[in-house]
Amino acid sequence: MANRRKFSQAGGGGGGGVFDPFGTKQAVSSLRKGGRLPVYVAGVFFVIFVIIMYGEDIRSLTLDPIARAGTTPARIVEPVVTEERHVARVNPPRREVSSAEKAAALPLDVDERPKLATPTPTEAAKEVPKVEKIRKPKKPKTTKKKPRKPRPAKKTVAAAAGGLLGVPETCDLSKGEWVFDNTSYPLYREEQCEFLTSQVTCMRNGRRDDTYQKWRWQPKDCSMPRFDAKLFMERLRGKRFMFVGDSLNRNQWESMVCLVQSAMSPGKKYVTWEDQRVVFHAVEYNATVEFYWAPFLVESNSDDPKIHSIQHRIIKADAIAAHAQNWRGVDYLVFNTYIWWMNTLNMKIMRPGGQSWEEHDEVVRIEAYRKVLTTWASWVNDNIDPARTSVFFMSISPLHISPEVWGNPGGIRCAKETMPLLNWHGPIWLGTDWDMFHAAANVSRTAATRVPITFVDVTTMSERRKDGHTSVHTIRQGKVLTPEQQADPGTYADCIHWCLPGVPDIWNLILYTRIMSRPQLV
């Protein structure tokens, strides 16, 4: 009652009382009799309080079309990231915006496909489109396909069961580009191939970078399949495969042995040496992969594989029978001859009917080369059965001894080169004898009218690979170079031969593609 009296006095009538615009005094007086005063009064004052405090907000709500649509303006306006995060903590529904932020930032953190610490220029140029692909929901399919470049091999295995890989003869495999691929390359590991000689095991001999092993050749107008050792050995079952020529063909022979040996069981593969011939035996397939030493193809005073470093080289330009008797019955013959011609501009040729090497004449190199190739092609045409034997001629393997040509005037031969020449347009003047190149190409295409000869052009693609040579990570006189010798690349760097795994693997992949894309011979 005391409280009621105070309230009544505070709101009482009379001229000195408080102005009562809503007539609350009469309402209180009438309700006092019914005993419901506290509830009624509380309700009235609550309504008054709401109207006074939120009147402006209520009017703005009735006028704001966004509010009528039930959408919060903060969801449309994109503020600074820090403000976004602050609102998200106060208002939980804002977490949707936070997820969108994470999705937009994802490519900056996720795309870690390049495995090397130093990406190549080609990779760097390709990184931007890869990042953009991850931003779009549909693009993960594209990024997943990138590492699976050898997919055509899977498709061609089925086709190969019928004898074909499906790569057309019209596709020029010599034109293309080197693509960095550390997913599917190298095709084998140096330490996994027991048949490599110390001349080509660059990593074992002290080379620190292995980037040279991870470049895939991509032809311009078609694709080559990945090398399938078991598929290839099935084609070679019961057959002989032979490389004939100089040390570059021996380099390629070692590569081929390492490519195929994985298809055989331990103890079912071994190598034998027989005079000028080295033979890899694949016991389970009753097949051999061989190398025959004949640096000029015809007979010469350099035919001893153990003592052939002769300063004055002399050839019998029209004598090939002594060598060729070892080529009879071979199912695949791969020839080459070049590097041994390059120490002089003129070539010494034994005179017809001469009885000793002293009886010789000097002939311009290109003329002697054409004469030897004509002798060789005539033998092929007269002695090879095209229904049984396939014949190939490998083009020139280039040297890299002039670093100023590729923009490294301070370099020493091919030493310390770790990258191919990328995005290079036009010829590279490395000293390659293009007259000899064209002579070999023309003879291969025209001289043997009865037997097809496939000229395998590996010259231009190999000219880009200044990084692939053994350099100072090789042997000299049967021994690995000492640290002192390795520190003198001007004297000891070998810029002729190639590290394995490496460039010759691609040469063999071209051979594999051509062979497996043709019908199997008898």
From Swiss-Prot:
Its main location: Golgi. One of its GO terms (cellular component) is Golgi apparatus. Expressed in roots, leaves and inflorescences. Residues 59-522 are lumenal. Residues 135-154 have a biased composition (Basic residues). Residues 1-37 are cytoplasmic. GO terms for biological process: xylan acetylation. This is Xylan O-acetyltransferase 1. It comes from Oryza sativa subsp. japonica. The lineage of its organism: Eukaryota, Viridiplantae, Streptophyta, Embryophyta, Tracheophyta.
